């Protein structure tokens, strides 16, 4: 959004300028990754959704908000570099794929599986 629109939103919400942060990347995948980075390493739960269509991400946003986990974006048959990098940094205990195999392929699921934190046996 434009700076003017951000200012209008800030004003309408009654927020001070130090309470509003802009998160941006070179594309929607990098923007989602930049936002996810604010969650920090060891985030217990993360979600991935298709980046070219919003219904699955929107449907999963309630769960993400409840669990405090970020939603990262993927393509139908590939994982953007920004998403891979951030998943490696987050190392979530659980990773939920929002969407069917018709939306997010098994190739993508297999590619993101290694980013799930390994189980640590109890002593």
Task: Pin down the residues of each PLM region.
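Extracellular glycan-binding segments that recognize GlcNAc-based cell-wall polysaccharides
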Residues: 1-123
């Amino acid at each position: 959004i434009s700076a003017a629109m951000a200012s209008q939103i800030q004003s309408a919400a009654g927020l001070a300028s130090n309470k509003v942060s802009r998160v941006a990347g070179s594309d929607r995948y990098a923007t989602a990754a930049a936002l996810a980075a604010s969650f920090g390493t060891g985030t217990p739960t993360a979600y991935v959704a298709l980046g070219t269509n919003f219904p699955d991400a929107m449907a999963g946003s309630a769960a993400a908000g409840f669990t405090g986990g970020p939603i990262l974006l993927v393509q139908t048959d590939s994982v953007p570099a920004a998403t891979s990098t951030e998943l490696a940094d987050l190392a979530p205990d659980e990773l939920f794929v929002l969407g069917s195999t018709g939306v997010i392929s098994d190739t993508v699921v297999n590619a993101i599986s290694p980013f799930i934190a390994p189980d640590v046996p109890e002593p």
